[in-house]
UniProtKB/Swiss-Prot annotation:
Superkingdom in the source lineage: Eukaryota
Chain segments annotated as coiled-coil in the UniProt record: none
Organism from which the protein derives: Caenorhabditis briggsae
UniProt record similarity statement: Belongs to the TRM44 family.
Short name of one Pfam family: AdoMet_MTase
Enzyme class (EC, first level): transferase
Full protein name: Probable tRNA (uracil-O(2)-)-methyltransferase
Keyword Methyltransferase: yes
PROSITE patterns given in the database record: ZF_C3H1
Region (Disordered): 520-546
Lineage start: Eukaryota, Metazoa, Ecdysozoa, Nematoda, Chromadorea
Zinc finger (C3H1-type): 535-562
GO cellular component, one term: cytoplasm
Length: 562
């Protein structure tokens, strides 16, 4: 092998002394496990089992190509790289990277393909290394073989190196990193996901009529359905006779699971429009779920239900392990909004041990895990690869020896004998919308006048007023005004946003809305029908009636009635 030359380096400094070796090992681990963070061509990486047939084939190919045997190298590892677009014939679907430590702070990477196609990650060998200028700094370096053209490494020494530096700066060795799909065969999951997304999800996207963004909503449920299928395939969960998706929302997950041969139904306190259109053939039931009924041993679900699913089930989330325990069945749960048994979850961290700091969501997740464990479930946790910020899941399986022997007392102790109150079928959306018309108009006019008089700025003959901090604007409200907003679960900013024809709120300031400078919402960008609907005149033009210069657009161009 030819000599190596450094093509990129950066010094990273810390406020306190750091363990450089531990930091280096951590970023190497991240680099191997998350190639998708480096290249959008790669979906994931899968470690190759040592001394397996594939391992030996890769090593033989390596020796033939690079003319040396890596078998005696320190911490030798081989990863298979799964490309994102498997239909692209120009890239290899049988590609690998061989990595080993040549020195304590130097790792060599060598690409290998077994099908003669182009490697989708990096086609040439490269190295990652670091030096230790001081006990509170690390010099990170990238190397390439001297005889390899520089243009092969343009991406590696810019964007890829930048990601590596970002990791090095943000490492927290005290924090446990949850690996994505740690319970599954990643390659098998990707194959299942591709099938469900393309064969079932893609037609749904093309025919989607809801306001929500179809790619996110549908592909997220494709990922969850794929994950549940792989739990069953791997034996982590047995195939259910029938599942019930509690708080099923739009019902897409129920539809997808049914389509891949997993029988079950969904239940939600409120039906959705899509139930009667796209998903009219799916068993989706409009009914409140009362866990107290299950706790009291009264029938609530179909008798043959043996898997409970909670996908963002809000206030029912902690009750799903409890209901599963009473039914002696398994459960799959993705906690979302933090609720305890009878209200909002408050992070006191008592279940996490002394002096452990954590986020609200992490604390809630760990508390929900502790509920499952106290009930006696064989409890596993994992991280899903879905387009959501809440993607940690809990899998609870009834062990062969059964759940905890004192189940009734455990449930009574956890719930403290209180009664669950289900949410109403129709949720009243306050947000300052039910303040009387007289009060709304009075407050809006007062705030309008204050902003208008805050500046003498005039644009094309129209007085624009000033840009006023919300804190200053709040000073114009009386105690009675504030109480009106508070009673409606809102505040000044909510009130202003509700009157978007008059006010524009941006970064803790408010100014008058000037429709000569239109602002299109993200919802309107993703839904042209919504944009068209908002352009139709429905309300009188506030500026025409109240602004001393009238409407800046005039009746021909204004979207409101003149």
């Amino acid at each position: 092998m030819s000599p190596w030359r450094c093509i990129a380096e950066q010094l990273v400094e810390y406020e306190e002394p750091v363990d450089a070796k531990a930091y280096f090992d951590k970023i190497i681990c991240l680099w191997k496990e998350y190639p998708n963070a480096i290249s959008n061509r790669i979906n994931t990486s899968v470690p190759v089992e040592e001394e397996s047939q594939v391992w030996n084939e890769v090593i033989a190919n390596f020796e033939s190509k690079y003319r040396f045997d890596p078998a005696n190298s320190s911490e030798l590892s081989i990863f298979k790289l799964i490309q994102r677009d498997y239909k692209r014939q120009s890239f290899s679907n049988n590609c690998y990277e061989v990595a080993f430590y040549e020195e304590e702070l130097l790792v060599r990477f060598y690409p290998i393909v077994l099908d003669g196609q182009q490697h989708p990650h990096f086609e040439s060998p490269y190295s990652i290394a670091c030096k230790i200028p001081s006990n509170s700094s690390i010099l990170l370096q990238f190397f390439k073989p001297v005889d390899t053209p520089d243009d092969h490494f343009e991406f590696l020494k810019t964007l890829a190196f930048k990601q590596l530096v970002t990791w090095l700066k943000s490492i927290d060795l005290s924090k446990t990193t949850r690996k994505t799909h740690s319970l599954l065969d990643k390659e098998s999951y990707i194959s299942t996901y591709r099938h469900i997304r393309e064969d079932l999800g893609r037609p749904l996207v093309e025919g989607w009529t809801e306001n929500s963004k179809p790619q996110k909503v549908i592909f997220e449920d494709c990922g969850i359905a794929s994950y549940i299928q792989e739990l069953i395939t791997s034996g982590i969960l047995p195939k259910p006779r029938k599942f019930v998706d509690i708080g099923c929302g739009n019902g897409l997950l129920v539809h997808l699971l049914n389509k891949i041969g997993i029988p079950g139904y969904g239940v939600d306190v409120r039906s959705r429009k899509v139930w009667k259109t796209t998903l009219s053939h799916v068993d989706l039931r409009e009914s409140p779920v009362d866990p107290q009924i299950v706790v009291e041993n009264r029938p609530h679900f179909d008798a043959d239900v043996d898997l409970l699913i909670g996908n963002h089930s809000d206030e029912l989330t902690p009750w799903i392990p409890v209901m599963a325990a009473k039914l002696n069945c398994n459960f799959f749960l993705i906690p979302c909004c933090p609720y305890n048994f009878f209200g909002k979850y408050l992070n006191n961290g008592s279940h996490l041990g002394p002096k452990r700091m954590t986020s609200q969501y992490e604390s809630f997740f760990e508390w929900t895990v502790s509920v499952s464990e106290r009930l006696g479930f064989d409890t596993k946790m994992d991280r899903l690869a879905i387009p959501s910020t809440k993607r940690l899941c809990i899998i609870g399986r009834v062990p062969e020896k059964g759940l905890c022997p004192s189940l009734e007392q455990t449930i009574e102790h956890m719930t403290q004998g209180q009664k669950f109150v289900a949410r109403p079928r129709e949720i009243r959306n306050n947000n300052c919308m039910h303040i009387s018309v007289t009060d709304r108009e009075r407050i809006a006019k007062k705030l309008f006048d204050f902003i208008l008089n805050a500046s003498d700025d005039v644009r094309d003959g129209w007085r624009c007023g000033g840009e006023v901090p919300l804190a200053q604007l709040a000073g114009q409200l009386t105690d009675d005004d504030k109480k009106l907003m508070k009673d409606q679960d809102g505040g000044l900013q909510t009130f202003l946003r509700n009157h978007h024809q008059i006010f524009h709120v941006f970064q803790a300031t408010a100014r008058l809305r000037d429709f000569r400078q239109p602002v299109v919402s993200r919802r309107q960008q993703t839904n042209p029908k919504k944009q068209e609907a908002t352009n139709r005149p429905k309300q009188p033009c506030w500026m025409s009636l109240n602004h001393p210069d009238g409407c800046p657009l005039g009746p021909e161009s204004c979207r409101y009635l003149h």
